[in-house]
Design a protein with these regions (language model features):
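Conserved SGNH/GDSL esterase-like catalytic core that processes O-acyl groups on lipids
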Residues: 5-108, 115-122, 127-139, 229, ...
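A structural motif corresponding to the C-terminal end of an alpha-helix
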Residues: 109-121, 154-166, 207
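Substrate-gating cap/lid alpha-helix
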Residues: 133-169, 263-278
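Flexible glycine/proline-rich, aromatic-decorated loop/lid segments
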Residues: 172-178
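Conserved catalytic region of serine esterases and O-acyltransferases that act on ester linkages
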Residues: 9, 26, 184, 188-306
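Flexible glycine/proline-enriched surface loops and loop-helix/loop-strand junctions
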Residues: 138-141, 181-189
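Non-membrane alpha-helical structural segments and their capping/turn regions in soluble enzymes
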Residues: 93-104, 145, 149, 194, ...
Length: 306
């Protein structure tokens, strides 16, 4: 998929609407950063209209608050990214028919509108995330996931029927939540924490506006040669106890994970990676611009650090 075919395109005026998931994207800037990186030169403009607790049928606002339509027109929105389904899923199986009606009504209400004054707005539907098992705090997590999965499937089918792009966040987050001894994604089962937004933002950005892969660089301590993509080495100097070199990144750096940097194993592919092969046994410290950033054994360096 190239930028011209992607749901979000360089230069677009993007509007997010939806529930707490959308609302909190503004407090966790990973997605916005990724979209701006990938549209550098002709950057997207982002307006977040998400509101905690919003559903397709209920969007309470203070008196005299600007309408959604007036805000979309003021922003000259080219694309609307709609994040719904979590609140609606609490109605269970009996609420699916009404949710389908609401989805179709939402799509119909926007589809022909020219908020940018030139062309019909494009729509993207985004599913809710999975419900995380936090033990005694989330006793109904399996039941909740059955409901969320059903609402996600309905969103997928509805989007396909009307030719609207759909992004499934339920499947990827459900898979991550199966991990053992891995960081939790949420604070209460349904609201993502900072790490959760880091995880989800990359998947959502890849679906909206694909970008380059993180750089990978491998250095052989014995020969001094390097291989990889997305970065290159220069001014390399090697001694029996140390090595020094300059790394030139040929693309935007990947976004480091928050906190202590621990990530799910399957998400390490989203990080820039440096590996050093053929080091003598021992521990080695990486110093970047005079600041220590990582210490690892020769075995860990050979495997690569992100």
């Amino acid at each position: 998929m190239n930028a011209a075919e992607s749901p979000v395109r360089p230069g677009d005026h993007v509007a997010f609407v939806g529930n707490t998931f959308a609302d909190q994207l503004r407090s966790h800037g990973y997605l916005e950063t990724l979209l701006l990186q990938r549209s550098a030169g002709n950057p997207v403009s982002i307006r977040n209209l998400g509101w905690a607790g919003d559903t397709l049928s209920a969007r309470d606002r203070p008196t005299n608050f600007p309408t959604e339509t007036s805000t979309l027109e003021a922003h000259k929105a080219d694309v609307i990214i709609a994040c719904f389904g979590m609140g609606e899923s609490f109605a269970g199986e009996s609420g699916l028919a009404e949710f389908k009606n609401q989805l179709n009504a939402f799509i119909t209400s926007h589809r022909a509108r020219k908020y940018n004054g030139k062309s019909a707005v494009r729509l993207v539907l985004v599913s809710p995330i999975a419900y995380e098992n936090l033990g005694a705090r989330t006793p109904r997590w399996q039941e909740r996931n059955r409901d969320i999965a059903a609402y996600t499937q309905l969103m997928n089918e509805t989007a396909a029927n009307v030719g609207v792009p759909f992004v499934d966040l339920y499947g990827p987050t459900a898979e991550l939540m199966k991990g053992k001894n891995t960081p939790k994604l949420t604070d209460n089962g349904i609201n993502l924490n900072d790490y959760g937004y880091w995880c989800v933002s990359r998947a959502l950005a890849d679906a909206l506006l694909p970008g380059s892969k993180p750089w990978v660089l491998s250095v052989d301590a014995k020969s001094g040669k390097s291989t990889g993509h997305g970065a290159r080495i220069s001014q390399a100097k090697f001694t029996t106890t140390a090595m020094a070199f300059t790394v030139q990144e040929l693309a935007w750096p990947s976004l480091a994970a928050p906190g202590k940097g621990q990530v799910h194993p399957q998400l390490k592919r989203n990080l820039d990676q440096l590996s050093i092969k053929n080091l003598k046994p021992g521990n080695y410290r990486l110093v970047v611009d005079g600041k220590p950033v990582a210490t690892a054994s020769h075995i860990q360096w050979a495997a690569g650090l992100g």
